[in-house]
């Protein structure tokens, strides 16, 4: 693992990278660290900034980080007015799949996604053929029967091939039946049900209130013992609908 990576939530360090923790299990541990960068140009401004930030981690208290953002071979300093035009150029030159916007919050990610769809891709419908969607919650339901997919993972990207039928409104949510393909899994096509409301929430997926309502209403519809109800919910297409964001 990378020693500069964030540790698990609520922990000071990652136990998986701790020699002391592993020795506590009775293991004999050797440790080493790779420091030479092999897959980035030596004069890269990205590498220079990353190395500077990595070196700061050694100090306590941590100094205020500073980035050197002079335009160069791999950094171009843009004004906000130039962002959409530059992003459109990137899409045309490198493709949408090879162009990524990094932003500081889920709320701003939603704003960027809507701006891209409306002002670069000129898509007005909530969901359109060709839309790239990002799965925001692991799902084992819809991949069943497809040998190319063990499960649909949080972070998987899929492309809308076609919509099937009308939007359905149930449990306080809106559902759509779509055929999608997975570029990272040999473009395998599968039919899925997705929750449209999750596309534009300012949270990574559905809000807590939306999840609780979906769970309680689907649970109440089932019959039998508590265990039988839970078992039935595992096969319920609406309860197992994919939660996705624009990618």
Where are the regions a protein language model picked out?
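Long insertion/accessory domains within large nucleic-acid-processing enzymes
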Residues: 202-247
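Conserved helicase motor core of P-loop NTPases
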Residues: 5-153, 159-161, 165-221
């Amino acid at each position: 693992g990378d020693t500069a990576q964030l540790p698990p939530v609520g922990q000071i360090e990652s136990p998986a990278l701790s020699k002391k923790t592993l020795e506590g299990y009775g293991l004999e541990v050797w440790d080493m660290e790779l420091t030479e960068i092999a897959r980035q140009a030596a004069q890269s401004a990205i590498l220079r900034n990353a190395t500077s930030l990595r070196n700061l981690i050694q100090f306590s208290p941590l100094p205020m980080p500073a980035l050197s953002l002079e335009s160069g071979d791999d950094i171009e300093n843009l004004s906000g007015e130039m962002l959409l035009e530059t992003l459109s150029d990137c899409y045309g030159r490198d493709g949408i799949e090879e162009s990524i916007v990094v932003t500081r919050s889920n709320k701003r990610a939603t704003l960027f996604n809507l701006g891209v769809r409306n002002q670069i891709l000129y898509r007005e419908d909530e969901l359109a053929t060709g839309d790239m969607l990002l799965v925001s919650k692991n799902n084992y339901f819809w991949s069943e029967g497809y040998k190319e997919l063990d499960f649909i993972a949080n972070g998987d990207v899929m492309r809308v091939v076609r919509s099937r039928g009308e939007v359905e409104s149930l449990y306080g949510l809106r559902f759509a039946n779509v055929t999608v393909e997975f570029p990272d899994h040999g473009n395998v096509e599968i039919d899925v049900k997705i929750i449209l409301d999750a596309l534009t929430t300012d949270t990574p997926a559905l809000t807590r209130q939306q999840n609780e309502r979906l769970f309680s209403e689907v649970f109440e519809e089932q019959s039998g013992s508590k265990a039988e109800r839970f078992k039935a919910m595992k096969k319920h297409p609406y309860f197992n609908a994919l939660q996705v964001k624009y990618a």
